[in-house]
């Protein structure tokens, strides 16, 4: 393969089709050998290591991705790297920091729904039920069929003693 982008895309292909003979990380790592700052490969490796429950390694890749993607602008076009980093932090039990990074992820349109859903769940964890409802509603504004956001909303409403029947009966 001639370019970093080709290696990255080959890794994405292997990951999508779950080829049992090849792991996608070999492509992403080769891309990073050629360009240590290749942001898509850094994010892909963070996701790969997260999926293997190697959270420390995933965290390192995500931090490198954030460092490179935010060189010129903290408000990045895609919130994916912030979202992935927040997931890793949450898995490591760093809930406050995860919350902050989910908030950063929610600034990008591609990540609002999923980031607000995770924020609502962390609100519930912190017994901040009114905030959880607000954040779940925002997530639902970006995807009415989001089952996890609906569940978070119902849990928060029940915790406040509110009737959650209308959300349960929505299609």
Residue spans of the language-model regions?
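Residue-level recognition of tetratricopeptide repeat
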Residues: 12-13, 47, 87, 121, ...
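Residue-level detector of the short coil/turn that links helix A to helix B
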Residues: 18-19, 53, 93, 127, ...
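Single-residue signature of alpha-solenoid repeat helices
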Residues: 24, 58, 98, 132, ...
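Structural marker of alpha-solenoid helical repeat scaffolds
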Residues: 34, 68-72, 108, 142
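TPR alpha-solenoid repeat register
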Residues: 41, 74-75, 81, 115, ...
């Amino acid at each position: 393969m001639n370019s970093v982008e080709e290696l990255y895309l080959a890794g994405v292909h292997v990951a999508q089709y779950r080829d049992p003979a090849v792991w996608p990380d070999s492509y992403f790592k080769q891309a990073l050998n050629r360009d240590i700052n290749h942001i898509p490969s850094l994010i892909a490796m963070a996701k790969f290591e997260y999926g293997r429950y190697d959270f420390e390694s995933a965290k390192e890749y995500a931090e490198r991705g954030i460092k490179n993607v935010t060189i010129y602008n903290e408000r990045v076009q895609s919130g994916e790297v912030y979202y992935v980093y927040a997931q890793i932090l949450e898995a490591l039990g760093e809930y406050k920091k995860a919350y902050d990074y989910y908030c950063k992820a929610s600034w990008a349109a591609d990540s609002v729904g999923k980031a607000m859903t995770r924020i609502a769940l962390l609100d519930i964890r912190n017994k901040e039920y009114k905030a959880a409802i607000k954040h779940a509603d925002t997530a639902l504004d970006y995807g009415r069929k989001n089952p996890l956001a609906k569940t978070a909303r119902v849990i928060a409403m029940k915790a406040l003693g509110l009737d959650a029947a209308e959300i349960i009966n929505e299609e």
